[in-house]
Amino acid sequence: MEDKKEYMSYDEYLTKVKDGIVTDQGNCPVTPLLLMLQGKWKTQVLYEFCIYDRARFGQLKKDLPGITNTMLSNTLRELEEDGLIFREQFNEIPPRVEYGFTEMGRDLLPVFYSIMVWGFKHENDLHL
């Protein structure tokens, strides 16, 4: 389903930012996304879904050295609650659960790409 809603242009956005009226609430429109992505593991887990269309808990655990089972479970639950990923449980023995991007999560891929390009451009200036 294609989104037909018209959004402001970049130039309109910059003008509204300077006037302090980007959203009806008057706050930064990026804040909700940044709040959803807070935490050490969320962006790393989302990156895994860029690699795999769907992934199981064990695959994610294997690909994310250092993450505990509890932290991975909590991260997946929070990303699901925020609507960025889905959880599908199959009625099989042994039980099987797979995770993947929702449409809203998949819509973040161009955003992640832009952030990656910015990171490469400024990598020598970043103090990590």
Predicted features by range, described:
Residues 39, 43, 77, 106, ...:
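Generic detection of well-ordered alpha-helical segments
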Residues 91-115:
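Basic, amphipathic "hinge/linker" alpha-helix immediately C-terminal to the N-terminal HTH DNA-binding motif
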